[in-house]
From Swiss-Prot:
<dbReference type="Pfam" id="PF01595">
    <property type="entry name" value="CNNM"/>
</dbReference>
<feature type="transmembrane region" description="Helical">
    <location>
        <begin position="101"/>
        <end position="121"/>
    </location>
</feature>
<keyword id="KW-1003">Cell membrane</keyword>
<protein>
    <recommendedName>
        <fullName>UPF0053 protein MG146 homolog</fullName>
    </recommendedName>
</protein>
<feature type="transmembrane region" description="Helical">
    <location>
        <begin position="135"/>
        <end position="155"/>
    </location>
</feature>
<feature type="domain" description="CNNM transmembrane">
    <location>
        <begin position="6"/>
        <end position="191"/>
    </location>
</feature>
<feature type="transmembrane region" description="Helical">
    <location>
        <begin position="7"/>
        <end position="27"/>
    </location>
</feature>
<dbReference type="InterPro" id="IPR044751">
    <property type="entry name" value="Ion_transp-like_CBS"/>
</dbReference>
<keyword id="KW-1133">Transmembrane helix</keyword>
<dbReference type="InterPro" id="IPR002550">
    <property type="entry name" value="CNNM"/>
</dbReference>
<keyword id="KW-0129">CBS domain</keyword>
<feature type="domain" description="CBS 1">
    <location>
        <begin position="210"/>
        <end position="270"/>
    </location>
</feature>
<comment type="similarity">
    <text>Belongs to the UPF0053 family.</text>
</comment>
<dbReference type="Pfam" id="PF00571">
    <property type="entry name" value="CBS"/>
</dbReference>
<dbReference type="GO" id="GO:0005886">
    <property type="term" value="C:plasma membrane"/>
</dbReference>
<feature type="transmembrane region" description="Helical">
    <location>
        <begin position="71"/>
        <end position="91"/>
    </location>
</feature>
<keyword id="KW-0812">Transmembrane</keyword>
Length: 424
């Protein structure tokens, strides 16, 4: 009958198992860290902490460039450790326990619990919480095994070289990233929408935002001053296209300010042609980003839109283009609408709008039962005694905030934002 291991041998076995378990834990944690880290997060850490010249930084950068070889190093190390631990335990238990079945069962149980709990689950969980620290603290240890297994890692680098390049980031990836940042509260929904609009800014064509020609107010070169004045005053805009009476082509734009400045000079004859700004021509298939650049180059606020046959089909203003980024723009002379749409989930509403009309149409069907209750009364019916200018009202369906006119404190409107998880 074989005797149990001596005290010295038992100590050596325990030390060997602990050492191997530590190695397995380190490489397992590093596997999670190198898989979880993003290039921008690592670059930000290096620049913020001025770690560009550190050895650990160079090692991590090398691992990111040779990702497959790094993972193979970790997998080889883990498998070797698992084999060694299992065999050491088997030899120790085989000498101590007579029954081979019990010995094998204990070997399986101890090595399984040890490797799974202490060398896999625990280190990987901790690595998810401390990604940067794991990458920095254990970089040299993992690099040692990387060099130790160099023939295998080199072969892996050659085989997987064409797969090392990360796939390009798509707009959809960026949208998901923005949504995730919004959910974490790093910036507001409006900020996210502005960034998303910026991403698709170069894809929007002039044809999608232009004012069609049948809606454009214009005048002719030969029109009397009175007619031009009436069109300006009736339309309440600052610029107007001027057409040639013979060809019906746009010859330029006249500015309201120039018109009335000229009329004030009663001692000089009124000559419309002297007040014209040259017309900037853009195609209806031109991206608005390019159209904006062209208008800025010519210092023009309006541009004439033409189709592929060079026929005038509309106009586009710089304001129309900017609204694609920031949403609808209202000035002091715009008529205040009862419900103004700021974005897909946000509205600016007057207090006297019927609550049933607004909430049942835009927030949630059948949310308000009373057909005669106004927005103001409906918001005041909640438990916090209504809405004032110092706080917001938050419900399961929407968030409402009172917006007070700084020049007229009695004039209040409500900014109402629908929550993203509300289903109509």
């Amino acid at each position: 009958m074989e005797s149990a291991p001596s005290g010295g041998l038992l100590a050596l076995i325990i030390i060997s198992i602990i050492l191997l378990a530590c190695i397995s834990a380190v490489v397992s944690a590093y596997e999670t860290a190198i898989t979880s880290i993003t290039s921008y997060k690592w670059s930000n850490y290096v620049k913020t902490h001025n770690k560009q010249k550190k050895l650990t930084t160079k090692i991590v950068n090398h691992f990111q460039k040779n990702y497959s070889a790094c993972l193979i190093t970790i997998l080889v190390a883990n498998n070797i450790v698992a084999i060694l631990v299992s065999n050491i335990l088997f030899l120790a238990l085989d000498q101590s326990i007579k029954n081979p079945a019990i010995s094998s069962a204990l070997n399986l149980l101890i090595s399984g619990v040890l490797l799974l709990m202490l060398c896999e689950i625990t280190p990987k969980t901790l690595a998810r919480i401390n990604i940067i620290r794991v990458l920095v603290y254990f970089a040299v240890v993992v690099y040692f095994f990387y060099i130790l297994f160099w023939p295998i890692t080199k072969l892996a680098s050659i085989i997987f070289a064409k797969y090392e390049k990360a796939p390009p980031v798509s707009r959809r990836d960026v949208y998901f990233f923005i949504d995730e940042i919004e959910q974490n509260g790093l910036f507001t929904k409006e900020d996210g929408q502005l960034i998303k609009r910026t991403l698709i800014f170069d894809q929007v064509l002039v044809d999608q935002i232009m004012i069609k020609w049948n809606r454009v107010v214009y005048c002719y070169e030969g029109d009397p001053v009175k007619t031009i004045k009436e069109k300006f005053l009736h339309g309440q805009f600052s610029r107007m296209p001027v057409l040639d009476q013979t060809s019906n082509e746009v010859v330029g734009f006249i500015h309201l300010k120039d018109l009335f400045s000229s009329l004030e000079k009663s001692n000089e004859p009124f000559v419309l042609q002297e007040l014209l700004y040259p017309a900037v021509l853009v195609s209806n298939t031109t991206p608005i980003k390019q159209a904006l650049r062209q208008m800025r180059l010519h210092r023009a606020h309006l541009a004439v839109v033409q189709d592929k046959h060079h026929h005038t089909i509309g106009i586009v203003s710089m304001e129309d283009i900017i609204e694609e980024l920031v949403g609808e723009i209202y000035d002091e002379h715009d008529e205040v609408e009862a419900v103004q749409t700021l974005d897909n989930n946000t509205w600016l509403v007057l207090p006297n709008v019927k609550a049933a009309f607004f909430f049942n149409k835009w927030i949630k069907r059948d949310l308000v039962k009373s057909k005669n209750m106004t927005i103001q009364r409906y918001l005041a019916s909640f438990e916090n005694d209504g809405l004032n200018t110092q706080n917001k009202l938050e419900t399961p369906w929407f968030i409402a905030e009172a917006i007070v006119d700084s020049e007229n404190p009695e004039q209040i409107r409500y900014e109402i934002r629908k929550k993203s998880d509300v289903v109509d």
